[in-house]
């Protein structure tokens, strides 16, 4: 960016924060494009509080993706329905957009066995003990946008009866905790593969979330064998 600022190079790729901090000498044109970088909320499916997919889905339903895109990324991002670039040829219209739905989230939480306690926080009885839906969101403190994203998600969850809080970590601590599975929720960012292979994210052989699903593994394997674009899309939709 400093070289671009000094007009020593003609082209630079940057995020929104850099472009608001550095202005090149002379005229410059800015062209927006959708990259393969995906920011996401990661769940630790190994822990009791997040082992039920209905709980995870409820949390997802509470997130206002459009608000994050508009107010944190200054509309220089696009809310994705799933882990595929919205501009990719593989993208398809689900019709069911992922919009914030507090009522739907509440129904899912109750279906999963959670009930609001006297303080309005969801909890349940498990093995004779009270399990409270108190969740830590860890985030790398080096990224202002991801910190703000974590804080907005925290606020949305708190409003809905989930006692969420944010812990800002150094890059070293953050990577250590995510890599060792020492987290509940985390704000992550990854670059999706050009061939749209989602194995690193959801394959049972190894992912950060402890997620395992034999049916998903079968679909991922099929993605690697089919060649026609129509067949690949059909497997992806499955």
Each model region followed by its residue ranges:
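Ligand-binding "clamshell"
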Residues: 20-32, 180-183, 195-207
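Extracytoplasmic/peripheral linker and loop segments enriched in polar/acidic and small residues
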Residues: 69, 107, 159, 163-174, ...
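A local structural motif
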Residues: 1, 131-137, 155-169
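Small-molecule pocket liners
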Residues: 37-42, 82, 87, 207
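Append "and occasionally in soluble cytosolic enzymes with long acidic Gly/Pro-rich linkers
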Residues: 51-155
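Short helices/loops that flank or line small-molecule/ion binding pockets
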Residues: 1-8, 24-25, 53-54, 151-160, ...
């Amino acid at each position: 960016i400093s070289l671009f600022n000094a007009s020593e190079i003609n082209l630079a790729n940057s995020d929104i924060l850099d472009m608001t901090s550095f202005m090149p000498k002379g005229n410059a044109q800015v062209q927006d494009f959708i990259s393969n970088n995906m920011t996401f909320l990661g769940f630790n499916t190994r822990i009791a509080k997040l082992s039920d997919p209905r709980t995870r889905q409820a949390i997802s339903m509470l997130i206002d993706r459009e608000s994050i895109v508009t107010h944190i990324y200054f509309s220089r991002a696009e809310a994705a329905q799933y882990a595929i670039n919205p501009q990719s040829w593989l993208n398809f219209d689900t019709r069911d957009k992922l919009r914030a739905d507090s009522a739907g989230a509440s129904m899912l939480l109750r279906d999963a066995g959670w009930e609001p306690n006297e303080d309005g926080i969801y909890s349940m009885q498990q093995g004779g003990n009270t399990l409270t839906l108190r969740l830590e969101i860890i985030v790398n403190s080096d990224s202002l946008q991801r910190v703000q994203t974590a804080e907005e998600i925290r606020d949305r969850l708190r409003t809905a009866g989930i006692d969420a809080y944010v812990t800002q970590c150094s890059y070293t601590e953050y990577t250590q905790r995510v890599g060792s599975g020492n987290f509940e929720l985390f704000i992550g960012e990854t670059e999706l593969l050009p061939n749209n292979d989602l194995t690193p994210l959801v394959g049972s052989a190894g992912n950060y979330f402890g997620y395992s699903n034999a049916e998903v593994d079968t679909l991922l394997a099929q993605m690697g064998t089919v060649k026609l674009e129509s067949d690949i899309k059909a497997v992806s939709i499955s």
